[in-house]
Regions:
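Hydrophobic anchor residue at the start of the ABC signature
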Residues: 154-155
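ABC ATPase NBD Q-loop/coupling interface
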Residues: 66-81
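Conserved ABC ATPase "signature" region
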Residues: 118-136
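H-loop/switch region of ABC-family ATPase nucleotide-binding domains
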Residues: 200-201
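Catalytic Walker B motif of ABC-type/P-loop ATPase nucleotide-binding domains
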Residues: 165-168
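Conserved small/polar residues in nucleotide/adenosyl-binding loops
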Residues: 245-252
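Conserved ABC ATPase signature
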Residues: 140-144, 148
């Protein structure tokens, strides 16, 4: 379970224009898929950083309140410990790559933790099957398309078997076909009982998958919709808060 308890955060001078958050209270139950939506700068990305520990361990700023993930207080444990529980896929997958070839990139996290070679091989084989990556193995990462890079990033996170997956605007650099692949990955994780947090401005592909849509504005939670409540909104109500209709044509 994820619990954000009265958290306020403002960035330091280097990131002073980034969207902070104000008195956020949020609980996410195990196995839920939750979408954080709202305009750019509303605080969506900041919430993902609170969950994966990049705040307060990487981004400087002033923080009040606490965040717990699976009973552990994020501010009091090393970032590498949080990373064992929370896997992150960033808006630009290239920013999280450590290797040039795809196979080494996927296994990097396991190798970094010193896991046995046989265990890594077994996990790799399973991940290749789960993500249908046979044609992408042994490739130069920088010769891949945006969608292929994201598949590798997701595979590199999934092989670590975290309980929680956090994604920051994962569809922003994808075409329609790659967005369908992204939905399939999210559906696979959900079928495994993973807790999923997605910061997103395109919402059409998440219908029928997300359990909640949380609208963030001005660093605060304005609305917390269940899937049924979100479906009951009119097109005008959806468009007012999120870019729901931006890619509506791709539904057909």
């Amino acid at each position: 379970m994820i619990r954000i308890d009265h958290v306020t955060f403002s960035y330091g001078e280097e990131n002073e224009n980034a969207g902070g958050v104000h008195d956020i209270n949020l609980t996410v139950e195990d196995g839920q898929c939750v979408v954080l939506c709202g305009e750019s700068g509303s605080g969506k990305t900041t919430i993902t950083r609170l969950i994966n520990g990049l705040i307060p361990h990487y981004y400087e700023g002033k923080m009040n309140g606490e965040v717990w993930v699976n009973g552990a207080k994020v501010s009091e444990q090393p970032l590498y410990d949080t990373a064992k529980t929370v896997g992150s896929v960033f808006q630009n997958p290239r920013s999280q790559f450590f290797n040039v070839d795809t196979t080494s990139e996927i296994t990097f996290g396991c190798e970094n933790l010193g896991q046995p070679e046989q265990s890594i091989r077994e996990r790799l084989d399973k991940t290749i099957r789960d993500f249908r990556l046979e044609k992408l193995m042994g490739r130069n990462i920088f010769h891949l398309s945006g969608g292929e890079k994201q598949k590798i990033a997701c595979a590199g996170v999934s092989i670590m078997e975290p309980d929680v997956l956090v994604m920051d605007e994962p569809s922003s650099n994808l075409d329609a076909s790659s967005i369908l692949d992204l939905r399939a990955i999210l559906a696979f994780w959900k079928s495994q009982g993973k807790t999923i947090i997605v910061s997103e401005h395109r919402l059409y592909y998440l219908r029928g998958l997300a359990d909640r849509f949380i609208y963030i504005t001005g660093g605060k939670v304005e609305k917390d919709y269940s899937a049924a409540e979100f479906e009951s909104l009119t097109e005008q109500q959806r468009a007012k808060s999120v870019s729901y209709t931006h890619l509506r044509a791709h539904e057909t």
